[in-house]
């Protein structure tokens, strides 16, 4: 069983991720982990925080001599901005006069609901943990999950489909385009089509001028996974349900779509399914079964079917505005503009990277459930045996 947790606050000393259940013997590429963290920081419309942080994964346990040892992996990512918050957010009891309270909750954020739930007089501690800065730790854990998936020839990448009303017209993107996109060192908005990306940039430029924010849509693609991950026999093990929960857990994601789930709801059954064929002479490592389309997004009945798995996340515009909306003062209950905290304008590309991590962790967990193995050797041997079973079906 693969489990992960994160800890840390936005302006605390560091963020921590723990990952339990990774087989022993998995090679860990430090440069790859740091590259994934770098990818999360990119994109036009990010705020000033990204100029401060230089995220690097410091592995504290579970890895020696470049390979996992089967014990829990702990990863630490330091917050450079902590030096500016040490006195206002001390671990021990400090000078309350240096505390920076969030006096008026921001509509759309966790501020008010969190303060009510945990009985805080204001929202500083809610903001610190609810912040999307937490996804840094998720991306670090997701990088290790990706390394495990790569051992069986699979990978997970993302691209941006829409920012505001600007949209990629042809969303059937070849895997090679996503690989090329992930290798770029100059990232604008994470779209494979330069013309569509410029239209998206215009949307961000507009909200930069007006003090607003903008949301959008990203798509995560999981490539070259075998059929048979997940199951239909129990509701809480269905793969599409697990992926939806994983992506929906990301800050500001308000809807999740598997495949063409939204558009097929407006069509008829005869046009919504992916017809099945068979090639007796094929090069697939899995089976000779083929499909004419991928409306299902690679999942049928809660089980992967061997096609690319497609997961879309719909991101609302983030809640912190330079022109704040109406709110109330926590102390007086009188009208007061919502608090402003240094923030981003558009985070759709970064959300896509965080979603990659969540999808990779989910799929790696399903792969471990299917194939088992306390060591990488055992895991891969079981996978190869399953592939042989598929070939002889």
UniProtKB/Swiss-Prot annotation:
InterPro entries, alphabetized: Chorismate_synth (IPR000453), Chorismate_synth_AroC_sf (IPR035904), Chorismate_synthase_CS (IPR020541)
Q: Which gene encodes it?
A: aroC
HAMAP family documented for this protein: Chorismate_synth (MF_00300)
Its biological purpose is as follows:
This reaction introduces a second double bond into the aromatic ring system.
Species whose genome carries this gene: Koribacter versatilis (strain Ellin345)
Q: Mind telling me which residue stretches traverse the membrane in this protein? A: none
Q: Which GO terms describe its biological process?
A: amino acid biosynthetic process; aromatic amino acid family biosynthetic process; chorismate biosynthetic process
Q: What class of enzyme is it?
A: lyase
Know the name of this protein? Answer: Chorismate synthase
């Amino acid at each position: 069983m693969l489990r992960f947790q994160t800890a840390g606050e936005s302006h605390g000393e560091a963020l921590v991720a723990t990952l339990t259940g990774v087989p022993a013997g998995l090679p860990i590429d430090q440069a790859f982990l740091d590259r994934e963290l770098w990818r999360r920081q990119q994109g036009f419309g990010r705020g000033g925080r990204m100029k401060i942080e230089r995220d690097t994964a410091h592995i504290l346990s579970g890895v020696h001599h470049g390979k996992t040892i089967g014990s829990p992996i702990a990863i630490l990512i330091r917050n450079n901005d902590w030096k500016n918050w040490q006195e206002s957010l001390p671990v021990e009891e400090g000078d309350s006069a240096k505390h920076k309270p969030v006096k008026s909750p921001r509509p759309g954020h966790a501020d008010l609901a969190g303060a009510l739930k945990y009985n805080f007089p204001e929202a500083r501690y809610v903001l610190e943990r609810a912040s999307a800065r937490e996804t840094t730790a998720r991306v670090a854990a997701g990088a290790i999950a990706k390394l495990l998936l790569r051992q069986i020839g699979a990978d997970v990448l993302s691209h941006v489909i829409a920012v505001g009303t600007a949209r990629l017209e042809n969303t059937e993107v070849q895997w090679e385009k996503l690989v090329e996109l992930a290798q770029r060192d100059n990232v604008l908005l994470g779209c494979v089509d330069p013309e569509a990306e410029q239209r998206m940039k215009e949307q961000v430029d507009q909200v930069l001028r007006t003090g607003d924010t903008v949301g959008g849509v990203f798509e995560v693609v999981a490539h070259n996974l075998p059929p048979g991950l997940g199951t239909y026999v129990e509701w809480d093990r269905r793969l599409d349900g697990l992926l939806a929960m994983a992506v929906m857990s990301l800050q500001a994601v308000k809807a999740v779509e598997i495949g063409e789930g939204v558009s097929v709801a407006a069509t008829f059954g005869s046009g919504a399914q992916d017809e099945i064929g068979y090639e007796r002479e094929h090069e697939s490592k899995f089976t000779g079964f083929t499909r004419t389309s991928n409306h299902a997004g690679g999942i049928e009945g809660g089980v992967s079917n061997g096609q690319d798995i497609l997961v879309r996340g719909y991101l609302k515009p983030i809640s912190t505005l330079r022109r704040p909306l109406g709110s109330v003062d926590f102390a007086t209950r009188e009208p007061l503009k919502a608090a402003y905290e240094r923030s981003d304008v558009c985070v759709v590309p970064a959300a896509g990277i965080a979603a990659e991590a969540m999808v990779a962790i989910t799929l790696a967990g399903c792969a471990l459930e299917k194939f088992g193995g306390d060591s990488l050797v055992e895991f891969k041997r079981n996978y190869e045996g399953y592939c042989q079973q598929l070939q002889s079906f």
